[in-house]
């Protein structure tokens, strides 16, 4: 909070955006629609995402696999095996598809799910194994062609250094607020740039973290393809209402 507030103050005093202070410029950013829900059937999720594609212009979406820190258990039996082909069938080949396992799987199970994802042209497999088990995640990364991603939970810079040096993931996902602000996030960005790893920050709700991430993505080298943009409204995150003059 303090770090991002200081960056905001610097921008106000200099009459520049934080993106400019970081060496970038204001402008457009491609966003993917990020679903947070596991309590929804694959077909109903597909209908929801198709509506957003048609009404809001999203051309990429992320859905959920497994149960959160689920020890190989699904939200209900068979949901993961159903949601992957259902998303591709219903949304077509023109939409990029991402998926988040939220630390659900052992390496063996993650690789099995990863092959299903590859068969259905998904492009991003997030946090397949318990996030603190970097060696497990690296096994999955090395076994699959799909991009394996992670890092949202990590706030310890030595852990980031280890993750990047061992190439535990293909894409790093720092969360500006979990990590402690713009300044510490830029240190992770520098590490990732040296290792030639893209940076696609985590920002899973429509709080100020999304605003901060917009500025970051417009400024950094090695920025990933997307801004994560939550599609969940007040029924899921009631505290989001009226945070801004104009709700996103």
Which residues fall in each region the model found?
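Active-site-adjacent beta->alpha loops and helix N-cap segments on the catalytic face
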Residues: 21-23, 69-87, 106-109, 128-142, ...
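N-terminal capping/lid subdomain adjacent to the active-site entrance of alpha/beta enzymes
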Residues: 1-98, 102-111, 115-119, 239-248
């Amino acid at each position: 909070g303090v770090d991002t507030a200081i960056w905001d103050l610097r921008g106000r005093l200099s009459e520049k955006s934080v993106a400019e202070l970081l060496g970038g410029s204001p402008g457009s950013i491609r966003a993917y629609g990020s679903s947070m829900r596991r309590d929804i059937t694959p077909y109903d999720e597909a209908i929801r995402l198709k509506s957003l594609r048609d009404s809001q212009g999203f051309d990429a979406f992320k859905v959920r696999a497994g149960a959160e820190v689920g020890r190989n258990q699904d939200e209900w039996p068979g949901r993961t095996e159903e949601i992957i082909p259902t998303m591709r069938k219903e949304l077509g080949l023109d939409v990029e598809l991402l998926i988040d396992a939220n630390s659900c799987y052992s390496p063996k199970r993650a690789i099995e799910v990863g092959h299903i994802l590859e068969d259905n042209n998904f492009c991003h497999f997030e946090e397949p194994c318990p996030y603190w088990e970097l060696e497990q995640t690296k096994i999955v990364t090395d076994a699959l062609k799909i991009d394996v991603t992670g890092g949202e939970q990590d706030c310890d810079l030595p852990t980031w250094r280890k993750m990047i040096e061992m190439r535990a993931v293909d894409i790093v996902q720092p969360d500006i607020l979990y990590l402690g602000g713009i300044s510490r996030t830029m240190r992770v960005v520098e590490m990732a740039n040296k290792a030639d790893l893209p940076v696609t920050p985590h920002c899973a709700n429509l709080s100020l973290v999304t605003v901060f991430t917009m500025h970051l993505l417009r400024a950094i080298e090695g920025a990933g393809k997307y801004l994560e943009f939550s599609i969940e409204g007040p029924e899921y995150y009631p505290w989001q209402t009226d945070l801004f003059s104009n709700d996103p």
